[in-house]
């Protein structure tokens, strides 16, 4: 997630030595894209310097030769009315703050979740085990639901859970699982409770809720559903780029992608005297999908929205957008009021509001069900 004006408020990060994969990237160069057509070769250290200045980017070093970013997306007709209120409300009733607190306590206990560290690998393995357990306990695995690791050229893997539907067209919800201490990426303590442990456990709890519905569990929903947990977001949207580039190359159809990056911090709004709200990202997203999401929020959530801008390549929805798939993002607040502790050793669970995270989980359940069922 990006820093922007949050930078000025960020706490000082402390470097703590820990086990890691000994990778020397000081001399290695990476090709990044900072805006459409604006590319630059940088070292890993220069990547983090850009991030500290609030500059986001795609790392396109491993992009296929001849890749062309999408300039337009296919026209998709989204529902204009709510059709599955009874089913969604039944799912929402099962959402549990206690589950989210338990999962986030564990996820943020890893020394860090840096994409090149042993800890990043261990945390991804633990997270995938939780996803598999949810699928198994729901009985969905008997109808073809599965979770797979998506391997990259770094140690942390991405995770994709698939619940088949009657159509191969996919409804995607995603969140990045990695964390970073920008002062000491490889070895520094980076609990990443909000960025983005909060989004990761939000969609995990939403998956539990969605799999309470037997129509979905038994593969009878109109569309296929996928939940994604991306590796390497902080280093340039690496995991999500790889996944959506593969989907483009193999001709997969994505009806819509909703990104959840930071879902738990409300103090910035409270301190300003603002009503606690969702931050609806309005730039580099699908306007029609975002309009559909506004309808879902109005129906199923108890808080309003504030429009906000995130910038180019600010989070994983941008990877879907770049590959021609309609995407949207809803954040915990307006971007200028995000958690000031992100990317430090102070991004702790104690700063988060689980009632707010439940609102995000309600949104995810409503989004998936109304679009897929």
Curated annotation (Swiss-Prot):
Q: Where does Zn(2+) 1 bind?
A: 176, 195, 261
Q: Which sites bind Zn(2+) 2?
A: 195, 234, 343
Q: GO CC: one term?
A: extracellular region
- Per its UniProt record, what InterPro entries does this chain match? M28_fam (IPR045175), Peptidase_M28 (IPR007484)
Chief subcellular location: secreted
> EC class of this enzyme?
hydrolase
Q: How is the cofactor bound?
A: Binds 2 Zn(2+) ions per subunit.
Residues the record marks as carrying a glycan: 136, 196, 284
Cofactors (names) = Zn(2+)
The record ties this protein, via SUPFAM superfamilies, to: Zn-dependent exopeptidases
The job of this chain, per UniProt, is described as: Extracellular aminopeptidase which contributes to pathogenicity.
Please give the name of this protein.
Leucine aminopeptidase 1
- Which gene is annotated as encoding this protein in its UniProt record? LAP1
